[in-house]
């Protein structure tokens, strides 16, 4: 199967287990938990911070609480990576820290929520006021350097695009628009896009 392929909803790719739609459903369930935790933090008045619980490590950055609460609709990206074992992840974590430390400088960035799950895999939810706001982060030199290092730290990744019509902390569930699938087991990396379920 060539790079840059378009898949149909629900389609998996033989030999690439991470493309199994069941994995995306697991991701969406995890994102729902992450969002519920975000809502609980906002309602408690705590918003950002770092904490642990149930074997998980949470790190939440909210540049401006009012914008997070009031922005409607909102756009989100959910990231799930199949991390490489026996690798020093310090370099890419340092880049992440540097990028997120400048979160208030990125217009439209509502929240950055990173979770290390009990199984030692990573997931995060990044929320924006609008889809085009994500481009400002994507084009940042630090983010570009992190992208260049991704293959050293992950076997594969799934990036889910989400639309929150009722806002990031509203009551309505998000619309699942699409998933970008990237496999770093070959060079150049194999990529595919699969539509979501609306």
What does each of the following model-derived ranges do?
Residues 104, 138-139, 148:
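Alpha-helix boundary recognition
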Residues 87, 132-133, 146:
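A short local loop/turn or secondary-structure capping micro-motif enriched for an aromatic residue
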Residues 147-161:
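Conserved short beta-strand edge segments in small beta-sheet-based binding/regulatory domains
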Residues 76-81, 112-140:
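Short, well-ordered beta-strand segments in beta-rich or mixed alpha/beta enzyme
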Residues 1-117, 162-198:
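Short S/T/G/P-rich N-terminal loop/turn motif that feeds into the first structured element of a domain
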